[in-house]
Amino acid sequence: MSSPEGFGAAATGGGTPTASNTVTVTTYNELTTALSSKTTANSVILVSGTIDCNYFSVQLNNKTIIGLPGAKLRNLQITVGNSTTSAANSGILYIKSGSNNVIIRNLIFEGPGAYDVDGRDNLTNEGTNVWIDHCEFRDGMDGNFDIKGSADNTTVSWCKFTYLKAPIAGGSGGSADHRFSDLIGSGITDFPTDGRFSVTLKNCYWAEGCKERMPRARNAELHILNCYYKTSVSSARAIGLGAGNQGSTCYVENSNFEQIATISSPVNEGTGTAGLIFDNCVRGISSTAVTGLNYGTAPTKPSYTYTVLPVAEVAAYVSNASCGAGATLQVSSTGVISTNCPNTLGVNDNVENLDIKYYPTLIDNILNIEFSSIENGKAVIEIFSPNGSKVFTTSKNVTGNEKLELNIANITRGVYICKVQIENRVKTFKILKG
């Protein structure tokens, strides 16, 4: 994604990196100086290497933070047996209330491990119009990434959440295993100006070690799209939706709950109402549909424009170690971003529209696809069922103005999604098989 989709789509951060607006930081002092700066010269911050951090709270406006390959912000401070000291020294970055238009991409955030002492998170956001993309969050003391307070209009895309360190018991909070990843709304009376935290979670991966809060939310308007859940924690619980006093909705779409003990754990709290729906979601590679978990008044599908991966492809792409969720982007020393990903729907950062015509509207046996005069190359045509299963695929080297006649007589009647792709040019459309 070269720009955010979803509730955080308005985020532009500090703009495109240039020689005049970009600074590279390698130390904690350089990082905090650049974060605090309001000058144009520090609008885009490139993070290089591993930086050991203390907790830093800052108001950010029109700011972009990008990690160069392997960049990491970490705070490993912990004093087991001393809850007060551990809590005081915890946390990495807190985006304060009043922050607006912030982008953070391709960074690893690492904490000391889960320890229930009422400590801080690796990252906490109270800003508006925020895009967090291709980041990896590991071993937060209290949590990995929380959204609360005045935060609103946030998109979290291609992020990975994990716990690689064993949880630490005996903290003052009482939980022996506090690997609770992501909280949206800190209490039933915590909400932004318009009453609900509007958050899009797209192509995210809750991975090994996560136990709860994937996410836990109240007073929220959530869209969970193309996300992947795989953690061997025996008692793990994914989505915990509470109403809060303002009410909550959660639209879960084309997501794969491959390995998770409990997919949904409704929370009875507050004076509002809650509604959750699972649309075309599955449990693992067997593509067993997620059913029987909807409740409340069904939320409507978000009205904003967004791209969708077929659910059958979510596991492969989101968990891909070299081009999936996490800090997997390629970033040059000047801040130019690229990706290792193949040119696939929802994955490529630079997808363009393919110039084609297709007909008829109601197909009996033959689907006709006509390529314009400017199109040539290897065309890959794939057809997916509504649950994301691939039912047809073919490829052919085409030239300008060529027409393909595809015999799809063996496909059963119904609605399908067709994707046609030549290099980084893609066209997707619905077809009706009669």
Task: Give a label for each model feature.
Residues 349-434:
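C-terminal outer-membrane/trafficking sorting elements
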Residues 216-343:
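Extracellular beta-rich repeat passengers
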Residues 40-44, 100-102, 128, 152-153, ...:
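Loop/turn elements at helix/coil->beta-strand transitions in domains of secreted/extracellular proteins
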Residues 1-2, 337-353:
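Low-complexity, Pro/Thr/Ser/Gly/Ala-rich linker/spacer regions in secreted
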Residues 63, 72, 163-166, 175-253:
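Long, polar low-complexity repeats
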Residues 65-67, 102-104, 130-133, 154-159, ...:
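All-beta strand scaffolds that present successive hydrophobic residues in beta-strands
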Residues 3-45, 391:
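Acidic Gly/Asp/Thr-rich repetitive segments characteristic of extracellular carbohydrate-active
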Residues 52-193:
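Right-handed parallel beta-helix
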